[in-house]
Amino acid sequence: MTSGALPDNPFVAAGMIEDPRLFVGRKDELHAIASRMKGDQPTSINIVGEKHIGKSSLLYYFVLTWQQRVLHNTSRYVVIYLPLRGVDCRTETGFYEAVAEGLLNHVQGWQQRSLQNPWKTKPLNRQAFSDAVKEWKQQGKLPVLCLDDFESLLKYPDKFDNGFYDNLRSLMDSNALMLVVASRKQLDIVANVDHFGSSFFNIGHTIYLKELTTDEAIELSRLPTRSTNGAALSVDEQSHAQQWGDRHPYKLQSI
């Protein structure tokens, strides 16, 4: 968790909110993600929303706070955030290595070598990735991958083909892997447009990210700063932000 002083300007109009103290609302969505992690059959999720609606911030905040929502048997899960627009994720092997790096960061120390070793196979190709995920299942660990900007993979159909997606779907169906995938359009619609035939794109559950509720918008407009005990904006400025922003998180923070 982030500690220390709040920033002078608590509003983050462009980019992802990284300080959890500045994240507001989305309680229903956060609960929905956590509830689908629990149980013997985790359900993968597609988070769908327009640009600047807060998909990245939601995923990142969930990764920081999921233990507060799952509560029981938290040692079963390893939850990571992975922005797919990064250069490292432009090839299939690059994707697997980025996932491995994120997971290994959460299982450090000699006591956890049995969890580390499956991810150190070279090359970490499709088969090695599958074997590592299945080995973790045998050891009682569920990787939960929060994949941001999923459209980035779809730009490279020669690198990420139906076989890649079918393999992910197989791991999901065997309850060895859970994905939380953020995209601007629903995955099954994207698949039709881009002519992907994999059943991966018929993902288990879809959450549509919309504007904030009125109460959440008010809470956002009242965020404090490092230099004040109260809200960063005056009462008049808060009112203007709420009217102009129309409950849209990007607009509310662009005042």
Can you describe what each PLM-predicted range is?
Residues 79, 85-113:
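Conserved NTP-binding/hydrolysis module of P-loop NTPases
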Residues 44, 124-186, 193-199:
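Conserved Walker B catalytic segment
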Residues 1-25, 29-32, 113-115, 200-202:
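Conserved adenine-nucleotide phosphate-binding loops and their immediately adjacent elements
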Residues 35-42:
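Phosphate-binding P-loop
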Residues 89-93, 110-133:
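Short glycine-rich substrate-engagement loop in P-loop NTPases that contacts/grips substrate
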Residues 194-210:
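A short helix-turn-beta junction within AAA+ P-loop NTPase domains corresponding to the substrate/partner-engaging
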Residues 207-237, 244, 255:
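Conserved small helical "lid"/interfacial subdomain of P-loop NTPases
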Residues 48-81:
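P-loop NTPase Walker A phosphate-binding motif
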